[in-house]
Structures are given as C-alpha cells and as structure tokens.
C-alpha cells in the first residue's frame, strides 16, 4: 500500500522469486524529498513511544515492505546498509534548507557532537535497512533513540535466515574489560603463588639435603675412627696370636704329610689337587699366611718345601694386594721347575686335563682365584687340625685302635689282695671303664688347636690341654725318665692327657703299714689306684705311649700328706703341683713368660719322639704287640699270685711292703703295651 506522499519503499526480494540475485547492481537513487510540516513539540512522541512505534514497525516487516520514517529525514547508504536520519526542527544542526530538497547528508560525527542536555526537546531516530544480497531476502532493522540508552533489538520472524544486529553500549565494554582484568589478575596471582610454592619446596628440599649431608659426614668420621680402632685391635691380636702360631708351626713341621691331608680333606680345595699335586705336597713342610705392612692392603701366602725332584724353589709366595678400585690383584713368585716336570709337559704325557693347584698358584687370571685364596686364609689356615682329623690322621687311627682293643677284651683285670671275688671286680671295672670312656671322649673331642685364633676365651682351656698332652707324650718316651714303683697317684680327672707335673698325694693312698687294718687300707688304696691308673692307661691307648710309671722315685716316697713339691726328676718343673694353673698364670703375665716356660719344658727331641708316636708305623707295631701284651699280663698274674701265696705267711712290716710292691710292677709291665689286663 504505497502512498504518494511517502518516500519510495525499499525493494525487498521475495523468497519465492526464482530470479537470480543481483549482488553487483548499484543501489537505486534516493526518492525525492517532500516537505511536510513538523508537529509541535507537545505532539511529538516520547522516547518510549518511539520505541513502541519502532517495535510495531518491526512487527509489520513480515506483512509488507518497510516504510521509511516520517519526513524530514536524511538517507545515508554505505556497505549495503541504508540509514534514515530524522531530525526535529529545534535540534541543533537542523538546516531548514533541507526542507526543500535532499540537502547534504549530515556528517557522521553528528551523533557524537550532540550533547545529552540538548536532546530533551527533540529526538533523533535512526533506522537501519540492511540490503544484503541473500537468497532469503531477510532484512534487519534496528531503531535507536538518544532518549533510550539501552540497546534495542528489532526482532523479526523466527527464521534460520534472520540477521540480527546487536548494538552494545560502553558499559558492557567496561564490564568486559573489568572481567578480563580480573581474570588476568587471578591468573597472575595463581602463577605467583605457584612460583612461591616451588621456591619454598626447593628451599625445604635444600635444607633437608644439607642436614642429610651433615649427618653423612659425621657418619663417615665415625667410620674412619672405627676403621682405625679395628686395625689397631687387629694388630694387637696378631701380636697375641704370634707365639701360638709359631708353636703350632713347630709342631706341624714334624708331622709327616700333615698339610697334604689337610688340603685333601678340605671339600673346596681338594678339587684343585690332582695326583701329581699330592706327590708334590708330600714335601710341603709349612704354610704361612701373613698380612702386608698395612693390613688393609692385602696379604700373602708362603709355602715351604723340602728339597724335591719337581722344582728348585724352597719357598713359593703368592701375594694378594688391593688396587685403587678395591679389587685383589695377585702376584706370585715364578716356580723353577726341573726339566720335564712342568705342568704342561705332565698334562701332555698323562693326558690329565683336571685342574691343578700349581696352575692356580701361577695363573692370575682365574675368576675363582680370589675365592680360593680367601678359603685358604680364613678357613684352612685358621684351623688346619680340623681338616687333618676329618678323614684319616691321628683321631681316626686312635678310634680304630681303641675299637679293636674293645673287641678283644671284654673285661679288665687288676691285681688286688681279694681278687678271688671276680664278679665284684667285674662290676667295679665295668663302671670305671664307662666313666673313663665318657670322660675321654668328651675331652678328646674338645681339642681344637687353632680355635684360639678366633676367640680369646678359648686360650686358657684348649691350649693348656694341648700343652699337657704334648708334654705327656714327650716325657713318656724320654729315655732319661726313670721307671720305678709309685705308691702316690696322680689326679687326672680334669685334664685331657696325664701330666707328670700334676702329681699330688691322695689321702686314701697314705699307707703306714703299722696297723692291723693294713689289708683294708691296701684294698682302698688299690681301688683308688685302679681308678687313676685306669684313666692313665686309657689316655695311653689314645696317644700310643708308654707311661706306666707316673709317680715319683723311691727316694721321695716318704708318706707325708703335706708334700706339695713335684715328683718328677726334672728340676725345672718342681715349682708347684698344678701345671694348668701355672700355664694360665704364664699367659696372663704375657707371651714372653709363656714362651720361656715353653722352651724350658719342650725341646726338639721331644717333638721328634711325638712324631714317632703319631706316625702310622707305631700304630701297626702296637697292633702286633697287643696280643703279646695280653699273654704277658696273664703270665705275670699267675706268677704274682703264686708269689703272693708263698709270702702270705710273713706278718712283719717288711713283708707287707714286699707284698704290696709287686702290684705296681705288674701295672708297669702292662702299661707299657697300652693294655690293662
């Protein structure tokens, strides 16, 4: 419904039109302006009414073409948007010349130059008509009035193709900028807090590490002190062990085949020893393990040999020294083999591919070299007696001989005046034999020569027992030792072997032969003699020695109870009656006093006699003579019984002495062969 007095309506393309869109066509020329009188100010619509009118116009867009605002107005078109500017007559910048024609388009700064105080009399209406070349042909129109400060949006039909223009004021921009600033501030605050937290964590960790480093430094200082104290203590114990080691080496040197048996009986080292090594080890006399000048640097092993047909070295040394990395590096002296005795030549001849001890000794690249050296140093050399007695050797030979003697002799006999009661004697002797057997087994099994190297409390018991056993073996075979009758007995209940220095008077053995009850006193004394001499003979069986005469000479037999002096012919041992206490006292005084006493009691001849006793030849000789001893004991028993019957009628003091004296003589003859009866 076009009106002639109104401007030309905006051409709006229809949606159903099939004509192509003309995007590049120029806009149509503006319609001619008509002069219309302005209504008075009282009749002019208020901003609220203008807003309502604009809303009504917006609702009418879907019915017909959009109508321009009432005249006068100014058309501005740019970028496909046509704007109609309607000014009131009283508004500043109103030119009355515009009423007659199009006039000039107001500048774009008009809206900015109009103060709010001058708008109270009139209003400015701005209409936007969007002419977008879209296929849907939808337009967006928004009318803003200076009287209304809020954004006003013209809402058209609810379609997907609808275009909406939103005009925001400065308050929204300010709020958005404030929100952005707040977000940035919160983000900076959060970053600052995270940075401060990281710094605090780093400082806390640094303080913890400093405390840990200080504690570790203190611990290192304590470790250094402990290491120095340990080295001092180790040197001290080495000095304490030295006299015992020298004494042990002296004894071992006179035992043939000691080290070869010890090496072969060791389960770990015997793997390296072949038949040729066994032949070479028969010439081995001593093994020593010594620490270097500084204990922490390492140690060395020395093997001493006799003259042998295999090599010319008398001593071969293998040294283990720690390098800077703490690993043991070995060096050894070259072995000067005789021609044709080298290990390589022997292996080619015998086709023996097994390991050899001397190959290990000369080779320094074997991975198990350090382990074998540690076994020799910490196990074999510390206690070689244990491995020597494990299979074969002194202990097994003694047990074998003792078992044979037990099988041959079911009971033991002793010469007593009332010997006609054989059943009573059998019961007594069986009890005594069981007691002595238990005591002998307990004490012999406790002998460990080298245990003193590991504990200091073991010195006072084990070493003294071994000393007593060695002295007994030496003194029993000494040719200068006079053999006589003894009416005093030795109390051997607390020692391993019989010691001639432990002779003391027994109150039960004191016989004056002056009373009528001499027969009963002799019976009691003979019982005591039986017990003590039974222990002596059992120990003699274990050591294969002849110790039939344990008492003093006839000159010292005065029957005094207070006689505390020694009963041996050796004048050096007449200082006391208890050799065990004296040895302990010597040990407490120092190694020098102990060595001095040792030199006075032992000599080279004694050790040579001991070797003869321990050797296997002596064991075989004893087996051959055991039967002769049993026959001799029976013959002597018959002779003494006949002799006693002939002399029984004599009733004087001399006759009593003559009747008692043959009894020890029979004991002495039996004890030489290690047999009781």
Curated annotation (Swiss-Prot):
Main localization, broad class: nucleus
Keywords noted in UniProt: Cell cycle, Chromatin regulator, Cytoplasm, Isopeptide bond, Nucleus, Phosphoprotein, Transcription, Transcription regulation, Ubl conjugation
One Pfam family linked to the record: NAP
Factors inducing expression: By TGFB1 or serum in pituitary cell lines (at protein level).
Entry's localization field: Nucleus; Cytoplasm
Pro residues biased stretches: 25-44
Bias type Basic residues, positions: 178-193
PTM comment text: Phosphorylation at Thr-333 impairs function on cell proliferation.
Composition skew (Acidic residues), residue ranges: 543-581, 606-627
KW Cell membrane (keyword) present: no
Assembly behavior: Interacts with histones. Interacts with CASK. Part of a complex containing CASK, TBR1 and TSPYL2.
Protein name: Testis-specific Y-encoded-like protein 2
Gene source species: Mus musculus (Mouse)
Designated gene of the protein: Tspyl2
């Amino acid at each position: 419904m076009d009106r002639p007095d109104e401007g030309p309506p905006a051409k709006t393309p229809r949606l159903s039109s099939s004509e192509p869109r003309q995007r590049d066509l120029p806009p149509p020329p503006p319609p001619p302006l008509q002069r219309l009188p302005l209504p008075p100010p009282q009749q002019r619509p208020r901003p609220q009414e203008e807003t309502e009118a604009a809303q009504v116009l917006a609702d009418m867009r879907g019915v017909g073409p959009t109508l321009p605002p009432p005249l006068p107005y100014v058309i501005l078109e740019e970028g496909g948007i046509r704007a109609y500017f309607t000014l009131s007559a009283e508004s500043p910048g109103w030119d009355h010349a515009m009423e007659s024609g199009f006039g000039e388009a107001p500048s774009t700064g008009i809206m900015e130059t109009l103060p709010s105080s001058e708008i109270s009399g009139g209003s400015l209406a701005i209409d936007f008509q969007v002419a977008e070349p879209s296929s849907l042909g939808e337009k967006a129109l928004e009318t803003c009035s200076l009287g209304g400060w809020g954004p006003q949006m013209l809402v058209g039909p609810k379609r997907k193709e609808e275009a909406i223009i939103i005009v925001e004021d400065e308050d929204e921009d300010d709020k958005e900028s404030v929100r952005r600033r707040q977000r940035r501030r919160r983000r900076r605050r959060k970053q600052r807090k995270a940075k401060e937290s990281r710094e605090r964590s780093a400082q806390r960790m640094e303080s913890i590490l400093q405390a840990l480093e200080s504690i570790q430094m203190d611990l290192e200082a304590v470790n250094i002190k402990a290491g120095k104290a340990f080295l001092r203590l180790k040197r001290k114990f080495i000095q304490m062990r030295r006299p015992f080691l020298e004494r042990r080496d002296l004894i071992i040197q006179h035992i043939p085949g000691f080290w070869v048996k010890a090496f072969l009986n060791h389960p770990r080292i015997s793997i390296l020893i072949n038949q040729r090594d066994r032949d070479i080890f028969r010439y081995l006399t001593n093994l020593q393990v010594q620490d270097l000048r500084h204990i922490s640097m390492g140690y060395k092993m020395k093997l001493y040999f006799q003259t042998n047909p295999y090599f010319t070295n008398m001593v071969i040394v293998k040294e283990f020294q720690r390098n800077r990395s703490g690993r043991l590096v070995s060096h050894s002296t070259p072995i000067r083999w005789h021609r044709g005795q080298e290990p390589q030549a022997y292996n080619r001849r015998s086709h023996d591919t097994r390991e050899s001890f001397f190959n290990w000794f000369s080779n320094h690249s074997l991975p198990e070299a350090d382990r074998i050296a540690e076994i020799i140093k910490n196990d074999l050399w510390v206690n070689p007696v244990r491995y020597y007695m494990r299979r074969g050797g002194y202990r097994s030979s003694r047990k074998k001989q003792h078992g044979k003697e037990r099988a041959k002799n079911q009971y033991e006999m002793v010469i007593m005046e009332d010997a006609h009661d054989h059943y009573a004697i059998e019961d007594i002797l069986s009890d005594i034999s069981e007691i002595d057997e238990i005591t002998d087994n307990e004490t012999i099994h406790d002998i460990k020569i080298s245990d003193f190297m590991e504990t200091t409390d073991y010195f006072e018991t084990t070493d003294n027992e071994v000393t007593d056993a060695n002295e007994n073996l030496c003194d029993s075979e000494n040719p200068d030792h006079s053999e006589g009758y003894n009416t005093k007995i030795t109390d051997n209940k607390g020692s391993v072997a019989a010691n001639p220095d432990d002779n003391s008077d027994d109150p039960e053995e004191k016989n004056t032969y002056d009373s009528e009850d001499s027969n009963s006193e002799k019976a009691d004394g003979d019982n005591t003699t039986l017990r003590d001499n039974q222990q002596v003979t059992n120990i003699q069986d274990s050591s294969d020695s002849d110790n039939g005469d344990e008492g003093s000479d006839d000159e010292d037999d005065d029957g005094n109870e207070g006689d505390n002096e020694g009963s041996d012919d050796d004048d050096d041992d007449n200082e006391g009656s208890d050799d065990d206490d004296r040895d302990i006292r010597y040990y407490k005084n120092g190694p020098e006093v102990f060595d001095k006493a040792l030199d006075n009691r032992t000599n080279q001849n004694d050790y040579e006699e001991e070797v003869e006793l321990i050797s296997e030849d002596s064991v075989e000789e004893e087996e051959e003579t055991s039967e002769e001893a049993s026959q001799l004991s029976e013959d002597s028993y018959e002779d003494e019984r006949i002799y006693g019957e002939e002399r029984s009628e004599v009733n004087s003091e001399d006759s009593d002495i003559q009747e008692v004296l043959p009894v020890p003589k029979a004991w002495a003859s039996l004890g030489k062969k290690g047999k009781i009866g």
